Amino acid sequence: MPSGTEAVGTSPVVAVVVDTDGAIEQVDSLKTTYAGAPVTGLDVFRHAFDQALDHPGIAARQLGLAALSAECQECALVQVCGGGNYAHRFRTDTGFLNPSVYCTDLEHLIRHIAQRLSSAVGDARLREA
């Protein structure tokens, strides 16, 4: 099932940012990773939005599981968390090919939600019987 947010899940990125000067950039959260990270070199005056799909940074975010680290690909929760928020995976030496800095917290949260949902669904089924 596609993710409703780019913060988690393996769905392709579906948004770009248009700055006030007309520049087409990747999402603003990438500004936290390194200087110039969201820059594409595109603008609304000379480029179509579809051209952003050819930008290496955006193209990499269309790959789903293939763009994740081996550790993430082997994780049982990868379909849910998708490696976490893209910006949270950045490291100077390895780029974005890392688990989220919040990996442990994401795992705890996802397992907690799954347990609560499982209990709620089970309780609802018992009441229906």
Give the predicted meaning of each segment.
Residues M1, S29-E74:
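C-terminal accessory region of radical SAM enzymes
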Residues M1-A7:
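Long, K/E/R/D-enriched contiguous segments that form extended
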Residues V8-V13:
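Short, small/polar residue-rich loop motifs at catalytic or cofactor-binding pockets
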Residues D19:
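Acidic surface patches and DE-rich sequence motifs
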Residues G22-I24:
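Hydrophobic "anchor" residues
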Residues Q26-V27, G83:
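Short glycine-/small-residue motifs
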Residues T32-A35, V44, A66-A129:
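Radical SAM enzyme core and accessory elements
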